[in-house]
Amino acid sequence: MNLVPTVIEQSSRGERAYDIYSRLLKDRIIMLSGPIEDNMANSIVAQLLFLDAQDSTKDIYLYINSPGGVVTSGMAIYDTMNFIKSDVQTIVIGMAASMASVLVSSGTKGKRFGLPHSTVMIHQPSGGAQGQQTEIQIAAEEILKTRKMINEILAKNSGQSFEQVEQDTERDHYLTAQEAVDYGLLDGVMDSNNLK
């Protein structure tokens, strides 16, 4: 059961109740939490487009706590982050793993952060196939293309060589927030609204 808290805001015109996510959106904050899939991606994309249309000169704050998920859904968010004019500040809270690590590293350079005890995990995409041999071969080739694309993005975002990223994503590669900064996936560690 997913309960969404409600907040009450008082103004000169009276009281107004918001679900917490709508209230955060007023402050240009988007929460990306849980597995990345089509419905979530559509919601994140819509929020990014709305905030950019509202005022493209102000930053959008994308807080991420996700184990990753469907690559095509994540790429819809990634492409939108790069399409809009607003700078997108990314902040890892908890974990940004798999596709979520690609998103957190794709924030505006200089504005990619992690909280002190957050974790970033990079690895190769996973997938499966069944059916005729030719269908399995097509699926395997698609996974290899996807892996190359993800590794190219991680290399571009981190400043690491493609070969280094390819080696590091061979298996699950966990990084603390500071290690993610050292690797180039993040720009700083946030602590009590201050950067380390």
UniProtKB/Swiss-Prot annotation:
Active site residues according to the UniProt entry: 98 (nucleophile), 123
Family from the record: Belongs to the peptidase S14 family.
UniProt keyword list: Cytoplasm, Hydrolase, Protease, Serine protease
Protein name listed in UniProt: ATP-dependent Clp protease proteolytic subunit
PROSITE patterns, alphabetized: CLP_PROTEASE_HIS, CLP_PROTEASE_SER
Statement: the UniProt record of this protein carries the keyword Hydrolase: yes
Gene Ontology CC terms: cytoplasm; endopeptidase Clp complex
Gene: clpP
Domain of life: Bacteria
Alphabetical GO biological process terms: protein quality control for misfolded or incompletely synthesized proteins
UniProt catalytic activity: Hydrolysis of proteins to small peptides in the presence of ATP and magnesium. alpha-casein is the usual test substrate. In the absence of ATP, only oligopeptides shorter than five residues are hydrolyzed (such as succinyl-Leu-Tyr-|-NHMec, and Leu-Tyr-Leu-|-Tyr-Trp, in which cleavage of the -Tyr-|-Leu- and -Tyr-|-Trp bonds also occurs)
A GO molecular-function descriptor: ATP-dependent peptidase activity
EC number: 3.4.21.92
Subunit-structure text: Fourteen ClpP subunits assemble into 2 heptameric rings which stack back to back to give a disk-like structure with a central cavity, resembling the structure of eukaryotic proteasomes.
Annotated localization: Cytoplasm
UniProt function note: Cleaves peptides in various proteins in a process that requires ATP hydrolysis. Has a chymotrypsin-like activity. Plays a major role in the degradation of misfolded proteins.
Signal peptide: none
Annotated SUPFAM superfamilies: ClpP/crotonase
